[in-house]
Amino acid sequence: MAKPFDVSKFRKGLTKSIDGVSFGFSDPTDWISTGNYALNYLISGDFNKGIPLGKVTVFAGESGAGKSYICSGNIIKAAQEQGIFVILIDSENALDEAWLKALQVDTSPEKLLKLNMAMIDHVAKTVSDFMIEYKTLAEE
């Protein structure tokens, strides 16, 4: 018979190997509306909430389904209205400044950083580097 999985040992190993790892749940307290009550409800269970801050959110779907409009127009605009600096990673290099401005997105460098990259390794490195830098600044 196989030994049961030792969760305590696994947890200790993670704690030693990954700096800053935490365990348990952290329920979001801040949300950004998608601009669509039905979509907000599908994502959060609340017509007014939408996507949670502090969590990774991915929009995927068929071409022409409206992902770019929802993310670029509604979510970025709502985030900026809450005073949030937005980092937009455009994996298809498909979003142009005129279109974003037409959706009332502030494209100034003080409000938005748009990055064009298609390789998942580049995205992962960029996000990791940003998180390290952000954590360092927050600790100062």
Predicted ranges, named:
Residues 115:
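A contiguous pocket-lining binding segment that forms or flanks enzyme active sites
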